Amino acid sequence: MKRINITCPACGSRAYLRPASVVYGDKAPDPDAKYYVCGRSPACDCYVAAHRKTMLPMGTLADKTLRKKRHDAHVALDSLWKNGIMSRKEAYRLLQLSMGLPAEDAHIAKFSAARCDEVIALSRRFRAAAARAA
C-alpha cells in the first residue's frame, strides 16, 4: 500500500490511518474499520473513514459539526430511494447532475456544510414533488 499524505483542513496537521478504536473506543460499530484521524486528536476532532480495500479516505476529514451535517444529508438523500421515489442509482445521479459534479466528486463524504444543505434541500423538493404526484 502506497503511503499518502492527508492534511487536516481544520488545523493543518497531518492525518494518520488508525483503527476504529481510536475514534470509537470499545463501541466501534465496525472494529475492523480504519479511519484517517488528525494528528492533533483529541484536541482536533477531525477524521474520515477509509475504504476497506484501498485504504484511501472516503472523503475529507470533518469535525463533529460537519460529520453531523453529512449524516443528515445522507439520511435526506437516502429517503428518496428507501421510500421508493427512485432507485439508489437514480438518487445519486440526481445529486451529481443537480450539483454539476463529476461522478467521482458526487460523494457526501467530500461535501462542505453548504453542499450538504443543498443535498437536504434537493431531497426535500423531490419528496414534496413525489407526494404531490401521488
Describe the residue ranges of each PLM region:
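Short metal-coordination and nucleic-acid-contact micro-motifs, chiefly zinc-binding Cys/His arrays
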Residues: 1-7, 31-34
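Cys/His/Pro-rich metal-binding microdomains
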Residues: 7-12, 36-40
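Short recognition patches in nucleic-acid-associated and regulatory proteins
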Residues: 13-29
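Short Cys/His-rich "knuckle" micro-motifs
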Residues: 17-22, 48-55
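Cysteine-rich micro-motifs
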Residues: 27-51
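Extended interfacial segments that mediate partner engagement and assembly in macromolecular machines
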Residues: 54-89
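Short, Lys/Arg-enriched alpha-helical microdomains
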Residues: 109-123
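Long C-terminal interaction/binding lobes of large macromolecular proteins
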Residues: 121, 125-134
